[in-house]
């Protein structure tokens, strides 16, 4: 790979359900760091051929058929291709949930890919689910906990141990934004 290839930096956002990955991605987008979805990056070329493809289903099937390492390399290749075509220097990508993918990506491009784990206690995440879905705590548990279980079966919670950055998202939205801004200034040269 040519060292001039984009992205210069990609923040790979990880964490359990309702931890703030999308909020972080939207904030990054607002300051000039392009927001992307991992499954759409994976299905990028297939979506150009077939507009009706479901990127989530495609990503799951690809992992089943080819394995996590193949998926991780395809992600790297597709993201590099997209960023070079669009002259994207910096991006954030949601949602990295496979521990083995994170390890592989980190081993291949540690200087470009910043694995970022957003940490939030379960009770706070449940509150967010209650607000988002307009339900009580029991219904929120029925919605969120099965999603957490799936993510944890892939090792999403273990990504925290290998992350380049761990963001504590227990505080206010302003505190989250402050941490993200500090991180972007450390890794990016934004204009």
Where are these regions (language model features)?
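Phosphate-binding P-loop
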Residues: 2-8
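Short hydrophobic/aromatic beta-strand immediately N-terminal to the Walker A/P-loop
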Residues: 11-12
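ATP-binding Walker
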Residues: 18-19
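Walker A/P-loop
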Residues: 22
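Conserved beta-strand scaffold positions in the cores of enzyme catalytic domains, especially
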Residues: 30-35, 115, 164-166
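ATP-dependent small-molecule kinase phosphotransfer cores
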Residues: 33-104
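Small-molecule kinase domains that catalyze NTP-dependent phosphoryl transfer to phosphate-bearing small molecules
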Residues: 69-70, 131-186
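Conserved phosphate-donor/acceptor-positioning beta-strand/loop module used by diverse small-molecule
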Residues: 94-96, 109-133
């Amino acid at each position: 790979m040519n060292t001039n290839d984009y992205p210069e930096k990609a923040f790979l956002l990880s964490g359990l359900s309702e931890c703030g990955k999308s909020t972080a991605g939207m904030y990054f987008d607002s300051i000039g760091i392009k927001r992307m979805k991992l499954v759409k990056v994976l299905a990028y070329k297939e979506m150009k051929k077939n507009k009706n493809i479901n990127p989530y289903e495609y990503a799951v099937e690809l992992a089943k058929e080819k394995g996590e390492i193949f998926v991780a390399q395809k992600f790297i290749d597709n993201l590099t291709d997209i960023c070079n075509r669009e002259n994207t220097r910096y991006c954030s990508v949601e949602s990295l949930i496979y521990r083995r993918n994170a390890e592989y990506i980190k081993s291949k491009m540690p200087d470009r890919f910043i694995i970022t784990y957003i940490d939030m206690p379960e009770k706070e995440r449940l509150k967010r689910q209650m607000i988002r879905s307009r339900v009580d705590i029991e219904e929120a548990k029925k919605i969120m906990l099965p999603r957490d279980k799936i993510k944890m079966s892939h090792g999403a919670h273990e990504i925290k141990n290998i992350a380049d950055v761990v963001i504590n998202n227990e505080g206010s939205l302003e505190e989250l934004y402050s941490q993200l801004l500090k991180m972007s200034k450390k890794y990016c040269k934004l204009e």
